[in-house]
Amino acid sequence: MLRTHTCGELRRDHIDQTVTLAGWVHRRRDHGTVLFLDLRDRYGLTQVIVDPSSNPEARAMLDSIKNEYVIQVTGRVRSRLEGAENANLATGAIELEVQSAKILNTAKTPPILVNRDGGEDEALRLKYRYIELRRERQQHILGLRHRTIKFMRDWMDREGFWEIETPILMKSTPEGARDYLVPSRLHPGEFYALPQSPQQLKQLLMVSGIDKYFQIARCMRDEDLRADRQPEFTQLDIEMSFVEQDDVLDVVERLMTELVANVTPHKRLVSPFPRLTYADAIEYYGSDKPDLRYDLKFVNVGEIVKDSQFGVFTGALSSGGKVQAIRLPGCGSYSRKQIDDLQEVAKIGGAKGMAWMAIEADGSVRSPIAKFFEQAQLDQLKSATAAEAGDLIVYVADKPAVVAASLDKVRREMAKRLDLADKDLMHFAWVIDFPMFEYNAESGEWDAAHHPFCMVNPADVEKMQRGEFEGVRAASYDLVCNGYELASGSIRIHDRSIQQYIFDRLPYSPEEIQKRFGHMLEAFEYGAPPHGGMAPGIDRLVMLLADTDNIRDVIAFPKTQRAEDLMMNAPSSVDAKQLRELGLRLADGVEPRG
């Protein structure tokens, strides 16, 4: 080894020992004749002193070094001078007096700073990601990710799950997003797909009698990106045989509870995890992934305002819409500009406008729409929303989906403005009873709302088989936390006839269904057990544990929102010979970027 200790290891117990360290020059301070260096590796920093009076050769050798040079130093550990200790540094009580030194590698001046955040553009940071990863914050996040995955593996093993790898080269089957396709050289004109998830394979493992499976699974989806999505992502894939919904929820809830307590003990959570139906989540929060760290519930005021003289409200109700409100505590003094700004937030969700009422100190209502309501109606609105003096009530009236989306935007924005979200609280919750089918207004048909292997709620099977699709619930469930969906799962179909029924709801011919899913239908003819599972997203979980809102922060080498790797310049063109071997050529008019 080129070192005897790491740069974060030395303490008072090591004083007077001769040690060798190796690492990067984090910072240099030249105090005339004496040179001070902060030497850095993954484990921490150690202050190094080069004194020419005791070691002129080492001082001369290190005279030309700059930040990020890689060096090796050997010397004696000594106590820092009184008053020079650094309580913020684990090694802050000692320093290393250099006896010999060696430059292992030089370094150009980095395009981004390592010893502090220089506010560089994200594109520059991603291009030089290997330098950004030297930063303390980034190394902390990668360490947190490692501990999270290790805890998952150890925990699943203790619970009797087997870790089994499933293929990366798979068959292309519709699972919601576009597949990444891989052409086959040995079978010209045919393609593999990279897995969007191991969904079918883990179900087939249950048919195989494996009973309890897990995998740290890499998944790829060719979809439009956003701050919490990447084209390739990692999930803890779980499947279990002979289980019902509560069994799966129990396993994942225990895992998450113990993981948070062990990996991030400063974080708190609410236990047991609350359960919301999908209908209630939409009704009260406008989202199937609500942030429950703060209240700001929606209140349906349709019954109160239906006989008012305010045409916006009555018009929405008469056309099948709804009117909902949120009480914003302490915001009654908002200026007209502040309210107009908030109305623009509501419009992002599709609202045409946003009505408001401010509650004055004497309990009276100040609002441009107050004149359209009787005093009894105003009192009812205050009572229904629990509004008090100094509060602001905001309203949106429109189609139910627009009201939900608009007030969800307002709710999240106000939580930021009022600083309502506790960053140290991991507020997990289960969302259950999702609709099994969605009405397609264009086709006039009811389409499956989930992947086609999701089981219908047992209580609604007969209703589904009668063709009464509205209100049929899926045996599916989501784990949400702090406004993000962390995991999605379901009890799976294991009965061939029900699986065939669901496949028949897909927009494919019987021949196409057999081509795409025949292997699943055949497997279910050989004794498939009842089974279910889910797949917590590791990237999003670590994102929350690390207190960041950008998933790229928690992935070693992420892609941009245009699915580009700026460091390796991918995707890139390939030469004509490679295409010919695959039986491919670029379509006319398609020109690679370079």
From Swiss-Prot:
Task: Tell me where the signal peptide lies.
Answer: none
Where found, per UniProt?
A: Cytoplasm
Q: Which Pfam families match?
A: GAD, tRNA-synt_2, tRNA_anti-codon
Give me the residues that bind L-aspartate, please. Answer: 175, 221, 450, 492
Binding-site positions, ATP: 221-223, 230, 485, 537-540
Question: What biological processes does GO assign it?
Answer: aspartyl-tRNA aminoacylation
Task: Tell me which EC number(s) this protein carries.
Answer: 6.1.1.23
Say which enzyme class the record assigns.
ligase
Superkingdom, according to UniProt? Answer: Bacteria
Catalysis: reaction(s) = tRNA(Asx) + L-aspartate + ATP = L-aspartyl-tRNA(Asx) + AMP + diphosphate
Gene Ontology CC terms: cytoplasm
Q: Name one GO molecular function term.
A: nucleic acid binding
Positions marked as site (Important for tRNA non-discrimination): 31, 83
Give the primary localization class: cytoplasm
Q: Per the record, which residues fall in region Aspartate?
A: 199-202
Q: What are the alphabetically sorted keywords of the record?
A: Aminoacyl-tRNA synthetase, ATP-binding, Cytoplasm, Ligase, Nucleotide-binding, Protein biosynthesis
Assembly and oligomerization: Homodimer.
| PANTHER family, A to Z | ASPARTATE--TRNA LIGASE, MITOCHONDRIAL, ASPARTYL/LYSYL-TRNA SYNTHETASE
UniProt function note: Aspartyl-tRNA synthetase with relaxed tRNA specificity since it is able to aspartylate not only its cognate tRNA(Asp) but also tRNA(Asn). Reaction proceeds in two steps: L-aspartate is first activated by ATP to form Asp-AMP and then transferred to the acceptor end of tRNA(Asp/Asn).
Q: Which NCBIfam families match?
A: aspS_bact (TIGR00459), PRK00476.1 (NF001750)
The similarity annotation says: Belongs to the class-II aminoacyl-tRNA synthetase family. Type 1 subfamily.
Q: What is this protein called?
A: Aspartate--tRNA(Asp/Asn) ligase
* Species assigned in the record: Herpetosiphon aurantiacus (strain ATCC 23779 / DSM 785 / 114-95)
Q: Which gene encodes it?
A: aspS
